[in-house]
Amino acid sequence: MNALKVDDFLERRPTEEEAHLLTEIRDTGTLFRVASELRDKGHGNIISYSRKIFIPLTKLCIDVCHYCTFSRDPQKNQHSFMQPDEVMELLREGEKYGCKEALFTLGDKPELRYTRARKELQKLGHETTLSYLFETAGRVLKETTLLPHLNAGVMTSEDLRNLRTVSVSQEIGRAHV
């Protein structure tokens, strides 16, 4: 697909087949130019943001990525997961300061690495971190004015579909399909 063909998308949407072919373009400069023009045409040059309260549901993770400054090992005399009352207290504080979203961040499936994580999840009534996240994000929708935004790491298509029912947006490292 050449630059002229990409420029065609300024006037029409690509077909599904064409959209797949766009991933093979080597001339990323042209692709970025067309994407920028389409963005500006549709939304102008306004930069917007939404105030978020940061909810680190757990800092434990199955992975050990040496660039990561978020993840850590279990700490003595500390919960591995934020407790429901801690989460709700933080959410209320966010509402008080005008936040619109609750940004949930967490390590990827720590229960697969740490016995302690599995035991804490069981005490919370869950087998998985994603199950606990689902319950907690659901409470945000029901009990606060905030909108849950989930950054939950690697998920299956089923996980994504399930969590979509309790979130306004999701970020993923990658999806396993």
Task: Locate each region found by the language model.
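Structural signal for hydrophobic packing residues in well-ordered secondary-structure cores
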Residues: 10, 26, 39-43, 69, ...
